[in-house]
Amino acid sequence: MALNFYTAVYPTRCVVPRMKDRGFGHISFVSSAAGQFAIWGYSPYSASKFALRGLADAIQMELLPYNISVSVLCPPNTETGVFKSFHATTMPIIMRKMTAVAGIVSPEQVAVSHVNDIENGHYLTTNGLMGWFLGVGTAGASPERSLIQAFAQARTMKTF
């Protein structure tokens, strides 16, 4: 758990002072679709990715006055060696079924979509329709720069 979180915290702490001095910058965090909603069998992983999202949400607000932008990538199951090994050996059966429905994306698809979103000023990058719905459903207090996304979030929000 600590590995996923602190390997993002320490480099961020190192680069932020220099970015502030420079007057601009961008920090990108790699979370996961599993960091948007809790998944059975993924407790430590999901918790660490939720923590990254919380860190990104907070520092995005703190760094805005310094012209430093922040983005979060929440990729779905991605076709990598680690994923293939995990899928073949230890992935819970419920996740295998979800993967069959949601599909698997290539690392190239994930990278291209994130770079495009950064260039267009988006805070959150997701992949596919299921990822988009997750982004809308788990927006919370995260910044939103897309009018369409903001409308979808407002339309699906429950009143309390």
Where on the chain are the PLM-derived regions?
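Active-site helix of classical SDR
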Residues: 12, 48
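SDR active-site lid
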Residues: 65-134, 141
